[in-house]
Amino acid sequence: MALVFQFGQPVRAQPLPGLCHGKLIRTNACDVCNSTDLPEVEIISLLEEQLPHYKLRADTIYGYDHDDWLHTPLISPDANIDLTTEQIEETLKYFLLCAERVGQMTKTYNDIDAVTRLLEEKERDLELAARIGQSLLKKNKTLTERNELLEEQVEHIREEVSQLRHELSMKDELLQFYTSAAEESEPESVCSTPLKRNESSSSVQNYFHLDSLQKKLKDLEEENVVLRSEASQLKTETITYEEKEQQLVNDCVKELRDANVQIASISEELAKKTEDAARQQEEITHLLSQIVDLQKKAKACAVENEELVQHLGAAKDAQRQLTAELRELEDKYAECMEMLHEAQEELKNLRNKTMPNTTSRRYHSLGLFPMDSLAAEIEGTMRKELQLEEAESPDITHQKRVFETVRNINQVVKQRSLTPSPMNIPGSNQSSAMNSLLSSCVSTPRSSFYGSDIGNVVLDNKTNSIILETEAADLGNDERSKKPGTPGTPGSHDLETALRRLSLRRENYLSERRFFEEEQERKLQELAEKGELRSGSLTPTESIMSLGTHSRFSEFTGFSGMSFSSRSYLPEKLQIVKPLEGSATLHHWQQLAQPHLGGILDPRPGVVTKGFRTLDVDLDEVYCLNDFEEDDTGDHISLPRLATSTPVQHPETSAHHPGKCMSQTNSTFTFTTCRILHPSDELTRVTPSLNSAPTPACGSTSHLKSTPVATPCTPRRLSLAESFTNTRESTTTMSTSLGLVWLLKERGISAAVYDPQSWDRAGRGSLLHSYTPKMAVIPSTPPNSPMQTPTSSPPSFEFKCTSPPYDNFLASKPASSILREVREKNVRSSESQTDVSVSNLNLVDKVRRFGVAKVVNSGRAHVPTLTEEQGPLLCGPPGPAPALVPRGLVPEGLPLRCPTVTSAIGGLQLNSGIRRNRSFPTMVGSSMQMKAPVTLTSGILMGAKLSKQTSLR
C-alpha cells in the first residue's frame, strides 16, 4: 500500500496489488475496525523513557476485536510491494513533511477524533515506510552480492588477460626467433616481385608458429593432467599417512600413559623394598651384635664349664675322703651310743632308787600322759608285765635301750612333719608360726616331755598314743633285723637325716629364741611403763602363771601351758640321744600346770597370785545377779533405763577394784587358747572376742561386755607377724565347767575381765541392731593401766576382708555333722544335761569338800526375769549382770554359720566349736564344751539349761 501525497493533499493513486479497487488510500479507523472478518491483530506498545521503539510483529499480546484498538497490519505480510523508484522517492518526501503536522496535533489534542485520525495516518505511514525500507534493503542486498560477484569475475578476467598477454609475448618472441632462423636459412635471391615474396613468407611463418604453439599447449595440458593426477595421488597418500601417523601418535600416547602408571607402581614398590632393606640391614646389624655377645658368653661358659669340671672332680675326691671318714665316725658313734645308753640305764636305776615309792609319777618315753592318769598306770603295768614275760637276751635288751631314744626323737620329728611348718595346715587358719613353735618346743633339749608340755601339744592324748603305739610296734619289728652298734639299717641315711634335722632345728630355735627375747623385753618394758613391775609379781615369765601378762604368747602359739624355758646348747649328737629330762623345778612347774582343778583353793608355797587380795565378804551372805559390784558408782539404775553404748567420763576414785584383777584364790588357772574353726570361717562376725585378755576361771559377768568384731577371712598361709593380728587367734575357750561357776558365784567369789572397747567397736554390731540402749556403758579399766577412763569413745571401726576370700578347704562336712548331732542331742537330752555335766566332773565334789554345799539349782532362783523392753543383757549397767536367763535354751533353729557360742564361764560367748584337721586340737584337763554355734538374741545370753558336757575321761 502506498500513499502518494502531493503538496500535503491526498490524491487517488493507482490500485496496488493486494488492495481493493476504488478505496481511498486515506480511510477512517472506524472503517477499518468495523470489519468483522479481520483476524486478531498482534500489537505491542513499549512505553519507555527512551525514544519509541516499534516492532512490526509481536508474538505475545493480541488486541481485541473492537474499535478501541488499531487492527494492524493493515497490509497483509504476504502482499508483494513492488514500488518504483519514483514512488519511493515521493513517499519519502511525504514522510519528511511530518514535521509540519506537529502543530496540527498540538492544536487538536482536545479533539479525540482528530487525534485518532492522526494516529491512524501515522500508523499507516510508518507501516508503509517500513515496507519500503524492507524492499530497499532486499534490493540493496541483491545488488551488493551481484557487485561482489562481478568484482571477482573482473579479477579473474584480469588475471587471465595478464596471463594471456604474457603467453602472447612469449609466443611472439618465439615466432620472431623462428622467423629469423628461417630467413637466414633461405638463399638470398632477387625476386622480381619482392613484395609478394614477403607476404608469403610471413604467412608460412605464422602457420609454423601456431602449429608449434598448439603442440606445446597440448603437451603442457597433458603434463598438467599428469601432474594433477600425481597431486591427487600424493594427496590421498598424504591423508593416509596422516591417518596412520595420528593412529601411531594415539598408540604412543596410550603406551606412554601405561608406562607412567607402571613407573609409579614400580617406584612405590622400590620405596617399600628400600625400607625393607634398611630394616633388614638394621636387624642384621643387631643380630651380628647378638652373635658376637653370644660368642663371648659361649667362651666364658666354656671356661666356666672347665673350671666346674675341675671343681667337680675335686668335690668327688673330697666326697670319697669324707665317706671314708664318715664310716670311721659311724663306728666311733656306735661305740659312744653303747656307752651312753649304759650310762642312761644306770642313771634311770639310780633315780628309781632315790625316788619315793609314794610318787605316782611314771616316766614315759615321751611323757604323753599325766603322772596320775589312768592311762599312765595301765601303760606302766603293761610294760612291767611285758618285761616280765619276755625274757630276752641281754644283747636284745641292750639293743632296744640303745635305739629307744633315737626312735623317740624320730617319732617327734615325724609328729612335727605331720604339720609342715612353712605352710599352713589345709583346712585351718593357723599360721606357720604356731607349728614352728610347737615343733621347736617339742624337739629342743630342755623342753621336757613330762607333765603338761605334752598335754598341751596339738595332738591329743588318745590319738597320739594310738599313733605312737602303732609306730612303736612297727619299729619293734624293724629292730630285730638291725645289728647292735648300728644307728639304723645298714645302707640307710639316718645320720645324715638326723644331722639335717638338727641343723634346721637349731636355726628354728635361734629364730624363736630371738623372737621370744624381744617379745619378753617389749612386754616387760610395757609393764614397767604402766607401773606393773611394782605389783610384786613373783611368777616366772616362763611359767604358766605368767600368761596373764604374756597374753600375746598364748595368742601367738595357739595354746597356753607351754613352758618357754631357756634352752642350753648341747652337742648335736648328744641332742639326739640325751634323755629329755628337766630339773626338779621344771617338774614342779609342770605339776602346777596340770589342767585339773583339784587344788583350786589350796595355797601353794612360793606361788603368789598377781593382785592377791582376800575378799572381806561373808560367805553366808547371798547376792543376787543384778546387784552392783564394788567399782560401780552407786547410782542404782534400773534396767529399763539402758542408754546408748557411748562411754561417758568416769570420775577417778581411789577405791580398790578387785573385779579388775585376778581372782583371789590359790588355784592354778589354765586357759587353753585353742584355735576353734567353724564351718562359717569366712567373713563372719565374732561375738565376743576377748582381745587376748587374761580371763579367770571363776568370775561373774558383771563387766564382761563382749565386743562384736568383724573377723576377716585369714588366708591359709600367714606370716609370723600376721598371726599376731589375727582376731580369731585370740578366741579363748574356757575349759572349766558351769557347775563350778554357780558354786563360786554363790560363795561370793567373783572376778571381771577387762574389756578395752565398747559395744560400738565395729560400728554397732549386727547382733544388737534390734535394740538401742539409753544409758552409757562405762568401760572398766584394764588391770595393767592406771585408774583412768578415756574421755571419749574411740572411733568405731570394722575389720574388712582386704585379702581375697580364700576357700578355707576345711573338713567342714564332718564338723557340720558333728555340730548337727550335738544340737540334736541338746534337743533330746536337754532335761538331763546339767546332771550329766556335774556328775562327769570330780571338780564339783572337790569344791563341795571345801564347804561349798549349795546346790546348783539354788542359785537359779535369784535370777531375775528380763523383759523385752530391758534390752540386751550385755548392754546393762556395770553391775553383776545375770549370767543365766530362765527362758530355756537359746533357740536351736539358728543357722550353723553363726559363729557366736555361749561359753561355760559366766555366759561368755566364745567360738568353742570343733575343728577337725591334722593338728588334732586337744581339750586338756576338764571337760570341753561341745555345742552348736548360736547367736545372741535380744534378752538372752545363755540358756538356763546347761549344754551337754563331754569329758575326756
UniProtKB/Swiss-Prot annotation:
**In this chain, where does the modification Phosphoserine occur?**
537, 719, 919
Q: Name one GO molecular function term.
A: myosin binding
Q: Which residues form a coiled coil?
A: 104-356, 492-532
Q: Where is this region: Interaction with HGS?
A: 359-509
Q: Which residues cross the membrane?
A: none
Q: Where is this region: Disordered?
A: 472-495, 777-796
User: Could you say which disease the record links this protein to?
Assistant: Developmental and epileptic encephalopathy 68: A form of epileptic encephalopathy, a heterogeneous group of severe early-onset epilepsies characterized by refractory seizures, neurodevelopmental impairment, and poor prognosis. Development is normal prior to seizure onset, after which cognitive and motor delays become apparent. DEE68 is an autosomal recessive form characterized by onset of twitching and/or myoclonic jerks in infancy. The disorder progresses to refractory generalized tonic-clonic seizures, often resulting in status epilepticus, loss of developmental milestones, and early death.
* Biological role stated in the UniProt entry: Involved in the regulation of endosome-to-lysosome trafficking, including endocytic trafficking of EGF-EGFR complexes and GABA-A receptors. Involved in mitochondrial motility. When O-glycosylated, abolishes mitochondrial motility. Crucial for recruiting OGT to the mitochondrial surface of neuronal processes. TRAK1 and RHOT form an essential protein complex that links KIF5 to mitochondria for light chain-independent, anterograde transport of mitochondria.
Protein's name in the database: Trafficking kinesin-binding protein 1
What organism is the protein native to? Homo sapiens
Q: What is the lineage of its organism?
A: Eukaryota, Metazoa, Chordata, Craniata, Vertebrata
